[in-house]
Amino acid sequence: MPQALPFPIRKECPPGACECGRDELLDAWDKAPDDTDIRVLRLTREQEKVLIERIESIATYEELGHIKQRILEQLGVRLTITPSAHGVSTVMGLSIKLVEQPGLCRRTRENLPAAVRRCFRNNPDIVYALLNSRDLLGIEPA
């Protein structure tokens, strides 16, 4: 018998519309709840909208770091932002991705990086601070 989930989770996407592995993640959690991280399922569509608004309202590089850390802590999802090896002349020169993992919806993997790009377009100082935070070899400090 399936265990009750400790929190409300994201509704499943229509069949064929997403390859997130939500059902497989839930099955794995059902078999071994202590070994399976289901935090990513906490991000419902409504909460995703709130998170997108929050990301778009980021005003400083420090806020960006805080949001990245909170996403990792609360959802177990890593947001990576790396400049192109060929240089960055626009926001499109940055690679902004959510690391793929079971349960992470395709729409979320597209929507959150798009929100970060919109934030960067509205606040180019964040991009400058991001680029300045890396050393000459392009390595982010630990």
Where are these regions (language model features)?
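Extreme N-terminal regulatory/targeting segments of RNA polymerase sigma factors
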Residues: M1-A142
